[in-house]
Curated annotation (Swiss-Prot):
Species whose genome carries this gene: Rhizobium meliloti (strain 1021) (Ensifer meliloti)
Family statement drawn from the similarity comment of this UniProt entry: Belongs to the TolB family.
Identification of the protein by name: Tol-Pal system protein TolB
Cysteine disulfide partners in this protein: none
Assembly: The Tol-Pal system is composed of five core proteins: the inner membrane proteins TolA, TolQ and TolR, the periplasmic protein TolB and the outer membrane protein Pal. They form a network linking the inner and outer membranes and the peptidoglycan layer.
Domain of life assignment: Bacteria
Length: 436
């Protein structure tokens, strides 16, 4: 892990109090209450960072991140009156207020003598005439996009009061080829679709990739050698290993919150039950024991409870149990069937796929089953995954016809549904924790 941090990221954030980049008092006027649902996006001016093409690319990614969140409306640069030539100078606030820029971002990117980039920015509340935030970062030039995502996260958090989610990655199943002979391989990308690369390269079917809590491993299911098995993949080295050598099919894996166990389904004699495997001792523990199909387990953030799907009542429904398998209780009672549950990182909600009336929906409910809300419905929506701040979901959608699945994101309130750009067809997304 330390090698990965040294060789890949090489990134250091410095809060520069000594250079005057100090956050203003907490009573600045600019704020967004993201609990209100369909909020009006905040007009924000994001100037081209000085100096050069790379600096402008960084400010462009920042603007794209904030716009995609649905909470910010970057103002067209053609409307800017003041042309920033000195990021250290106090802006002419009247020039920004007249175009209704309630917040202003200015910045600069320079190259140090050792080759590193130095990226710095300031966030201003134009109507209060106060600086809200100022930071600077050092990184290797190849990591410029990550710096942009980190700055966007800082702006998002300062204005909304919630952690951002832009400095994250998505692992997913990349699909190519005709529908009746589709090739599926694991791929990974930034949350905005950039920096995509394949993690596997074979004709074996792969499904349900999931990140470890430290983002260094992925667990997934593969049909390698015609035997469905759960695997672990080390992202840094590419090394793979089978999680247990069981006589039956293993599938639907997911890490425990502490990363020490993998929970999964094991199919034997026509039914499937939920097991955990300790990754150090390789010992397994059986958690369910029914003649049904119990699958898609997901831990609560504190690791004390597990939500899963089961058809023990005749059709797929959601159940919650203790981490030791105790107290198995059904929580879904609406029309239709429920599947692919996943617990929110905040612990307050469970997202799911619901099939009813010939359509598939993505929804959320509280862990006791109350407060069910459908966020989006279509021909085939499936496989929700949470952003690490628990405010945004990603899922995949298959439309009717000969095309393939695509990834979409949607706000927890059901607004701001957006297509996530990928190089080809994509399914089974999983959101990483925030990078460090």
């Amino acid at each position: 892990m330390e090698m990965l941090r040294r060789n890949f990221f090489r990134l250091l954030m410095v809060l520069v109090a000594g250079c005057g980049l100090i956050a203003s008092p907490a009573n600045a006027l600019v704020e967004i209450n993201i609990n209100k649902g369909n909020v009006e996006p905040l007009p924000i001016a994001i100037t081209d960072f000085l100096q050069g093409e790379l600096a402008q690319k960084i400010s462009g990614v920042i603007a794209a991140d904030l716009k995609r969140s649905g909470l910010f409306a970057p103002i067209d640069k053609g409307a800017f009156i003041e042309k920033i030539s000195n990021p250290d100078a106090t802006p002419r606030f009247e020039d920004w207020k007249v175009i209704n820029a309630q917040a202003l971002v200015i910045g600069r990117v320079t190259q140090e003598g050792d080759g590193r980039l130095k990226a710095e920015f300031r966030l201003w509340d134009t109507f209060a005439g106060q600086q809200m935030l100022g930071q600077q970062f050092y990184t290797q030039p190849e990591n410029w996009r990550r710096v942009a995502h980190i700055i966007a996260d800082a702006i998002y958090e300062r204005i909304t009061g919630e952690k951002g989610y832009f400095d994250t990655r998505i692992v997913y199943v990349a699909e190519s080829g005709p529908k009746n002979a589709r090739k599926r391989q694991l791929a990974i990308m930034d949350q905005d679709g950039a920096n995509s690369r394949a993690l596997t390269n074979s004709n074996d079917i792969v499904l349900t990739p999931r990140f470890s809590p430290n983002r260094q491993e992925i667990t997934y299911m593969s049909f390698e050698n015609q035997q469905p098995r759960v695997y672990l993949l080390q992202l840094e080295t590419g090394q793979r290993e089978v999680v247990g050598n069981f006589p039956g099919m293993t599938f639907a894996p997911r890490f425990s919150p502490d990363g020490q166990r993998v929970i999964m389904s094991l199919q034997q004699e026509g039914n499937a039950n939920i097991y955990t495997m300790d990754l150090r001792s390789r010992t397994t523990t059986r958690l369910t024991n029914t003649a049904a199909i119990d699958t898609s387990p997901s831990y609560s953030p504190d690791g004390s409870r597990i939500v899963f799907e089961s058809d023990r009542g005749g059709k797929q429904q959601l159940y919650v149990m203790g981490a030791d398998g105790s107290g198995q209780t059904r929580i879904s009672f609406g029309d239709g069937s429920y599947s692919t549950p996943v617990w929110s990182p905040r612990g307050d909600l469970i997202a799911f796929t619901k099939q009813s009336g010939g359509k598939f929906s993505i929804g959320v409910m509280k862990p006791d089953g109350s407060g069910e809300r459908i966020l989006t419905t279509g021909f085939h929506n499936e496989g929700p995954t949470w952003a690490p701040n628990g405010r945004v979901l990603m899922f995949f959608r298959q439309n009717a016809g000969a095309g393939g699945p695509q990834l979409y994101s949607i706000d927890l309130t059901g607004y701001n549904e957006q297509l996530v750009q990928t190089q080809g067809f994509a399914s089974d997304p999983a959101w990483s924790p925030l990078m460090e």
